[in-house]
Amino acid sequence: MSDYFSSRPSQTLTPMGNKPSGGGGGDDASSIHSKSSQYLMDILPDSMTLNESVSSIVANNQAKEFILPETDERSPYFINVPIPKAQPTSTTETKKPLAGDEAIDGQFVKEYPTDILVDRFYKWKKILKGLVIYLREVAYAQEQFARINYQLKGSVKFPFLTDIDETTNTITDPFTTAPRGPKKAQPAQKKVGLTDSEQFQMQMQQEQQENAVQAPTDESKMSLAPHEYKPVQTTESDNTSAASGFVKFGSGSIQDIQVILKKYHLSLANQQFKISKEITSTVIPKLEELRKDLRYKITEIKDLHGDFKTNIGAHIQLTSQLLKKYIAAVKFMNAHGIGNDRASPTNKKPHKLDPKHDPYLLKLQLDLQLKRQVAEETYLQEAFINLQSSGLQLEKIIYTKIQHALLRYSALIDSEARLMIKNMCQELQHGIISKPPAFEWDNFVTQHPSCLLNWKSNDPIPPPRKVSDVIYPHMKSPLAKCIKAGYFLKKSELLPTYHQGYFVLTSNYIHEFQSSDFYNLSSSTPNSTKSSAYSSSVSIADTYANANNAKANNHHRQASDVHNSSTTTGGTAGANGIRGIRKKSYLAPIMSIPLNDCTLKDASSTKFVLVGKPTLNENADVRKSSSSTYLSGSSQASLPKYGHETAKIFSKAPFHKFLKGSKPKNKNTKSSELDQFYAAAQKESNNYVTWTFKIVSPEPSEEELKHFKRWVQDLKNLTSFNDTKDRIKFIEDRVMKSHRFKAGHMSRNSVNIGSHTPCLTDSTFTLQDGTTTSVNLKGRAEKPQYIHIQNNSLADFDGNGFRSKVNTPAIDDYGNLITVERRPAQSPHQYSDYMATSGNTTPSYSSGSRPQSMYNGYNPAVSITSNGMMLQQSTANNNTNPTTNLRHQRNISQTSSLPGFSYTSLSLPVNSPGSSNSESSSGGYFAIPLHGNNNNNNYTQRNSEGSSPCYNDDQIRQQQQPLQMQPLSRTSSSSVNVTAMRSTSAGNSITANAPVVPKVMVNNQNVKTVAADQSATAPSSPTMNSSVTTINRESPYQTLKKTNSTGNVPCLTAEKTHAHPAFYKRGNNSAQNLTTSSSTASRVHPIRKHKKNVSFSSLNSLMFSKKGANHGGNLMTNQFMSGGIQEDDGDSTNNDTIKLNQSIYS
């Protein structure tokens, strides 16, 4: 930089004190101040200089008489350069900066050209020093950031997800790649031609191995060994799943998270290392070099201090005197000419003009002085120009160097920031953040059809298969229909004492069973809550069985052993979660009376007499089975008033097991009685016997008597046939005709279910005598013409459709016996509280097989049958619609879930009970009950603070409403309990003006689901009305909307949110922001502090990449502006290598 300042001008001006080389004795000063020129000075006025306030026009007019002011550029007194003030020599040395370039604080800078510039460039020097110190710290910090990011990369441990190899940057699958042991660090001198990233990674690996000894044991325990996880077997055609079971890599699934995080930290560590090396090796050295040069330039500026010493002031004073003398000489000549020595009247002091005062000579002297003055002024001006031009160039160089350093620094920091957004934010936004929450689950379910249902999150809950859906040969045969079933007391000629039995009337037989639970396969153990009255009634049989166990024949003992083993096996399997299958069916009746060999001999209001040939079950222990229901005269009084309770009290175990009685009997007495009973039963077998049947209740009611009368009528009609084919044809034809002809009449005159109890043969539709029929009567009298079944109110009756539904299958989905009649006969004590079913289906608990204790004290309002879920109505219920069917309400915990919107639709499938819509699932897998509430008796409305009321299906109606956005929080602990129901039967109607779901509270916020003028009250009873509608749970998740913003993480914002102070607020509102409770404590990991005195040898020993910097030349290159980001990573030829700075989705 030697060209910063030019040397002093070569020409030299004549000093002001030298005499001119031309003639003339003495200098100008001596000639001016001589006494011989005093006569000229007396002619001049006191001031010849014009006032500065005179305008330029006046100055031009008076320029011939007066001198222009010194501010005018044409004035001889004008100076166009500032005149430096000379400093005393005594103080100059004391105020001179010290050798150590330390400025004196608390004083102003001297107003001298060189001093002011020295001070300015000294400050620039300090700025450069501070900038170098800052950048050196930045380089150190970036190196430490790179180390931290490399350590963070090592903390990303997902042993079963796709990984990235640290050395080759290739994608590896832990289940398909053979595990490799830890690589040993190779000596640095053996590695030739390594890139900066490889050297840095190798150095980081060495440091991690050194720090592994000092690592806390907690972190080592967090790592999981790869052998603890096994790959998931997928189908051969599956190309969407990885070995871990998640969606394959590159699909935006969780499978990508390990590669994204490791790639992010690895690329960021490499970039930070490049930034540190770039600052240390390029930016800082240039600033240090500039600062060193500036030190020399400050010294050169100080050497120009003498160039600003001048006597321009003395020149101006001399010019002023010569100018005045010249003007006086000109005026003297104009007034007197040359003049003379004689006095005259006009010239009292005569004086002759001295020749040396000739105006020419004076003007020549004045011009020479002006020339010297201008030369001095020019010299001073050139000194200023030299100093200022050099200072300008120097400051421009300093400023440009600082600009380039800061520009490079900002480009490096910008590249780091863009790398964060590119390799982290955008990768996550294009990947897992943009996927729906059930993305992984749907793929997981579809890839395992052998062990999971093919049920996606957006699909409705698959309906369970009903027994009525099963098809098998002759499933609708009239031979397999149950006409009636109920309890009676029976005695015969050989058994004069009445005993109770459960009798089933079919198309061909009258079967006697121990109890109404004879078909219940799930009953295997006695109920511990049986009443003592029934226990006492069978105590004789139980004692006899225990006393004579050794006398039992081998056949009976083997049958008992087989059945006991099957029961034990079934119980053990049930304990293991698998339902056992019985090896031997115990549905064989105790006794069967064929209708072909049976005749109704006599009948009264409470009794009827049958004559027939019974058939005993060969595989059953007749003695034990019969004695189980044997009632002595003394024990008959202890019969319960309600015979229907037998289903709850009699054992569900096989027939050879009996309940122990509460009153001990004499052993010999009981043995004789049972021996007599057994002998009588053997005599009755295959012989014509006369039985007497009567009502169980000792004091039957009017309704019981009517029911008994229908039994008598049906027996009379059916026993009139002695051929099975004729009887079956008769039953089927009369059933079809009854429903065909009476469908219209019954639709117009609906019968009140609470006051009328229809059965197989109603009083108005009994077998008529004397009518013609096409059936071959075979000589038997009083053969019926048709049997009428109470039909439903369908106006258009379809015989084939009805035929496909009647009495198929034999038991309903609830495990109850199905009869042909509208509701089966049951124990008389149940009539007052009986709740009839609607339609052509059988009610639940017709035989007393389902104890009411299961329902916490109230009768269930819905029964499940093969034709659907039916409503049961009480006699007190005035809302009677015999054709309205309801879904089944299970006795399970109420669903606690989120409110959704419903559409009016009859054809949409309905989800399973106990669940409601969860977010983004539309009633799919995520509609899982969150909270349980087994108390069905208290259907009360919850407190409005943070809770929502319970609903019952009789108050839930569908209305088509516009979609509204509702505030919602995933951390909600309260939700809406909706009673789930199954699909209804065909023919249901929607109540258009029914009330809708009321306003609820979610997270202490109002959720508006209905209009302002609509309201509904919470039900106080779980009993359902007959008119209900389907809750549509297939509507999409309508409480949140997705807001996309450029460059930001997608947000989920809630509309009309009135947040409670405790309401959880989410920063990004992501779908997918998985929220945590505010009370959840954040996990704090120990952080190792980096020592400040770490050596920079690791940076100085590594060469910067040839692509990372531009040494010399133009700094504005593409590499410079890109901040050092290498898109190809120097590895563009290897297709198997992942690019650290490129998206995995590109």
Curated annotation (Swiss-Prot):
Its main location: cytoplasm. One of its GO terms (cellular component) is cytoplasm. Residues 1-32, 171-194, 553-575, 835-854, 909-982, 1124-1146 are annotated as: Disordered. The modification Phosphoserine is found at S344, S793, S944, S969, S1070, S1095, S1098. One of its GO terms (molecular function) is channel regulator activity. GO terms for biological process: actin cytoskeleton organization; cellular response to oxidative stress; positive regulation of glycerol transport; protein catabolic process. Phosphorylated in response to various stresses. stress-induced phosphorylation is partially dependent on HOG1. Residues 482-606 form the PH domain. It is found in: Cytoplasm. InterPro entries: BAR_4, PH-like_dom_sf, PH_domain, SLM1/RGC1-like_PH. Residues 1-15, 939-950, 969-982, 1132-1146 have a biased composition (Polar residues). Residues 564-575, 912-924, 958-968 have a biased composition (Low complexity). Keywords: Cytoplasm, Phosphoprotein. The modification Phosphothreonine is found at T808, T1017. PANTHER family: ACTIVATOR OF SKN7 PROTEIN 10-RELATED, CYTOSKELETAL SIGNALING PROTEIN SLM1. Component of the RNA polymerase II holoenzyme. Interacts with RPO21 and SSN8. Belongs to the RGC1 family. Positive regulator of FPS1 glycerol channel required for the glycerol efflux. As a component of the RNA polymerase II holoenzyme, is required for SSN8 destruction in response to oxidative stress but not heat shock. Required for cell survival in response to heat shock independent of SSN8. This is Activator of SKN7 protein 10. It comes from Saccharomyces cerevisiae (strain ATCC 204508 / S288c).
